[in-house]
Design a protein with these regions (language model features):
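C-terminal output helix
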Residues: 89-91, 105-118, 159
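Acidic, metal-coordinating helix/loop segments flanking the phosphotransfer/catalytic sites
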Residues: 35-53, 74
């Protein structure tokens, strides 16, 4: 079973009963759970607080779970996100996965299935803790994640709403902190820490 004791989980659902059940289940395992009745409240917290896993319902008043997922990925590209869909709602599940969700969970929630998916998602956030241990900032981790997706400095700057010069500065500091001198070694170092699979040589050659 995963170690929940250091995990910070954000859970979004407009049904108070569901929020209570989920928060109690995860808190009994040691996780620190923050619950939100509206997606926009969660998004505000994401911009200023650490989150290791985001779990959100899809159909809610105001901002939907898919919209929250999209915005959350802009704030924290590395963040694993799980979405909760109605039973048999395949089109919605597909939309969520295309938007960047790691997995989906169907209602009504089955405890065994729910915890299995949550544990798998938390394993994805473990490399981030290791990178934070290397004193990387959240912005540097976001830049690194996008770099490992094959994004150029210009694309990263646009996605993170920063100047190209700022992104270049983040990349230089990240390389220095991880003890590497080029992009190829940076990718290898990140992979060794468990952040990502190594991209293809063609991807590395196109980095600018």
């Amino acid at each position: 079973m995963a170690d929940y004791t250091r995990q910070r989980i954000f859970f979004v659902d407009d049904e108070v009963t569901v929020r209570r059940v989920v928060s109690r289940t995860l808190e009994r395992l040691g996780a620190k759970v923050s619950c939100f009745a509206r997606a926009r409240y969660c998004l505000e917290r994401l911009r200023s607080k650490r989150c290791d896993l985001l779990i959100t319902d899809v159909k809610m008043p105001g901002m939907t779970g898919i919209e929250l997922l999209t915005e959350a990925k802009r704030v924290a590209p590395w963040l694993p996100v799980l979405v909760i869909t109605g039973y048999g709602d395949v089109p919605m599940a597909v939309r969520a996965l295309k938007a960047g969700a790691l997995d989906f969970i169907e209602k009504p929630l089955d405890r065994k299935r729910f915890l299995s998916v949550v544990e798998a998602a938390l394993q994805r956030s473990a490399p981030i803790d290791r990178l934070l241990g290397k004193a990387l900032t959240r912005m540097e981790i976001a830049m690194l994640c996008l770099l490992l997706e094959g994004k150029s400095n210009r694309e990263i700057a646009q996605l993170l709403h920063r100047s190209i010069r700022t992104i270049e500065s983040h990349r230089s500091r990240t390389m220095r902190k991880l003890g590497v001198t080029n992009v190829v070694d940076l990718v290898r170092r990140a992979a060794a820490l468990g952040l990502t699979e190594l991209p293809t040589p063609q991807t590395l050659k196109t980095q600018r």
